[in-house]
Amino acid sequence: MASQKKQLFKIIILGDSGVGKTSLMNQYVNARFTQQYRATVGADFMAKEVMIDDRMVTLQIWDTAGQERFQSLGGAFYRGADCCVLVYDITNPKSFDSLDSWRDEFLMQGQPKDPEHFPFVVLGNKLDKATERKVQESKSQQWCKSHGNIQFFEVSAKDATNIEQAFQDIAKAAASQEKDEEIFFPTTVTLTKQDPKKQTKQGGCC
């Protein structure tokens, strides 16, 4: 059997409504930000090619609705994910307090093969509003440390601060899972048609 590394990684972005999940994805994929807010209905995704360890892979980034009425749809979107990104708003303490429930929901509905070692990344968004900060960076770092040393970045979807670096680490975290999930393809089998003239007749009953 020959093995081939994965070329596509599924990234799930979770967090309360209004924390900027769609804006983060749009800034990373399209380098664009809009002030207009439109709540995501159900889920949506964008794709971007990125270089990881000298090879090109595609990140399929899923932006999911933060409203409770859509959370029952989570299982269908979460399964098969290679990394989960938890987002909160540094000016909104409630969105930070929700990180535990979002993490637990993903583990319950996404059912990753190895829950204890599944990669999460936490993003504290709206760093451009640092003067209105309500969640201290040290508090977020402590939360991440207590949940298995989760990677953490403070970012801004508006001015792109730390966006590229954060998603590069997200991509690497997703790729780290493929050691246990390599895709195997059988080696090529060549079929040779036998010349009928060279076939020997065999007696016997049907």
Swiss-Prot record:
Q: Where is this motif: Effector region?
A: 37-45
Q: Does the keyword Cytoplasm apply?
A: yes
PROSITE patterns xref list:
RAB
- GO CC annotations on file: cytoplasm; microtubule; oral apparatus
Expression induction or repression? Expression increases by 55% during phagocytosis (at protein level).
Could you tell me where this protein is found in the cell?
Cytoplasm, Cytoskeleton
Query: A Gene Ontology molecular-function term?
Result: GTPase activity
Q: What is this protein called?
A: Ras-related protein Rab-7b
Q: Which source organism?
A: Paramecium octaurelia
